Amino acid sequence: MNNRPIRLLTSGRAGLGAGALITAVVLLIALGAVWTPVAFADGCPDAEVTFARGTGEPPGIGRVGQAFVDSLRQQTGMEIGVYPVNYAASRLQLHGGDGANDAISHIKSMASSCPNTKLVLGGYSQGATVIDIVAGVPLGSISFGSPLPAAYADNVAAVAVFGNPSNRAGGSLSSLSPLFGSKAIDLCNPTDPICHVGPGNEFSGHIDGYIPTYTTQAASFVVQRLRAGSVPHLPGSVPQLPGSVLQMPGTAAPAPESLHGR
């Protein structure tokens, strides 16, 4: 388990499914990824994105994660660090709990070593499931791991997930997370069979359907949270429960099936 902050930039592609969907998505998505460490003068960026990649991707944050980070940088002009969640994003999807534990360990480390850094959590496809666990979203009757302790919730400024399978299994992160409800945006392309139930689904909706429309929209939402000026607290006190829901930024067609605030 990594306890030292690591800020990385990555690129790649990922996918997630169940049964026949898994094989098809992995075959269509699995591409190489290259990441390069980025150092900050004092080791603490203005904000940091902890992102979990999807099924079959090499270590890193994946193509969707990279597009999200790039858009966030462009919109804020801030120093944005990146931490890729360390877990085996395998086809059998047995390691989501490991990924959640790694993300939680890193959040705790950042709260201690960089208390003024605003933390952003994100995930795509199977990686969204990892963030569901961190956020305390129930995944049916199966327990995959423990959520982030409530004492650290205020250190997290925003959450953004894409192609989240939990939307097919009971609801969105933004509607079900007791820690991050109003801080979260959960985006599902309405042609994505991994998160959407209904006609018109195509594998391309999951693989190619999130860049740039949805990654830009998610970044715009996160920018609002980062500029809200909430000051991280030292762990120990119980954070205030999420309050009002922020209005979603507009997007170009095709409009995403946003599950924020539902």
Curated annotation (Swiss-Prot):
Alphabetized InterPro entries for the sequence: AB_hydrolase_fold (IPR029058), Cutinase/axe (IPR000675), CUTINASE_1 (IPR043580)
Subcellular location per the Swiss-Prot or TrEMBL entry: Secreted
Documented EC number(s): 3.1.1.-
Alphabetical list of SMART domains matching this protein: Cutinase
A molecular function (GO) term: lipase activity
Top-rank EC class of the record's enzyme: hydrolase
Leader peptide range in chain numbering: 1-41
Region (Disordered): 241-262
Catalytic residues identified in the record: 125, 192, 206
Similarity comment: Belongs to the cutinase family.
Record-linked PANTHER family: CUTINASE 4, CUTINASE RV1984C-RELATED-RELATED
Function of the molecule: Shows weak esterase activity with the p-nitrophenol-linked aliphatic ester pNP-butyrate. Does not exhibit cutinase activity.
Name of the protein: Probable carboxylesterase Culp3
Organism of this sequence: Mycobacterium tuberculosis (strain ATCC 25618 / H37Rv)
